[in-house]
Amino acid sequence: MSITKEQILEAVSEMSVMNVVELISAMEKKFGVSANMSVNTNNNSEKSTIEEKTEFDIFLKSIGPNKVSVIKSVRSATGLGLKEAKDLVESAPTVLKENMSKNDAESLKKTLEDAGAEIEIK
């Protein structure tokens, strides 16, 4: 035998306010939900836009065992001179390059990881 929604509503309408509050609390615990959840009642066809990140920074976390190879890769990627590239690599952890496209950042990350560096894209 199943109880209908109408029967439940009738039973709840006959309860005191305190009993209804206790019932809601018990239902929240039993079903793991909150009665305070917000409901979007806006009828506009407004869509929330999720901004996709378009610029990325290459962050050198560590040099790894092959320092010379990493310096060469950094030098070719950044256009820095040998001394500047060496100083930059030795200052790890540091940002190597900023405001790159996703494809360029992924490509540079692969190149530097192949050289032995530990890289993070932020």
From Swiss-Prot:
One of its GO terms (cellular component) is cytosolic large ribosomal subunit. The keyword Ribonucleoprotein applies. The keyword Metal-binding does not apply. GO terms for biological process: translation. InterPro entries: Ribosomal_bL12, Ribosomal_bL12_C, Ribosomal_bL12_C/ClpS-like, Ribosomal_bL12_oligo, Ribosomal_bL12_oligo_N_sf. Keywords: Ribonucleoprotein, Ribosomal protein. Transmembrane segments: none annotated. HAMAP family: Ribosomal_bL12. Belongs to the bacterial ribosomal protein bL12 family. PANTHER family: 39S RIBOSOMAL PROTEIN L12, LARGE RIBOSOMAL SUBUNIT PROTEIN BL12M. This is Large ribosomal subunit protein bL12.
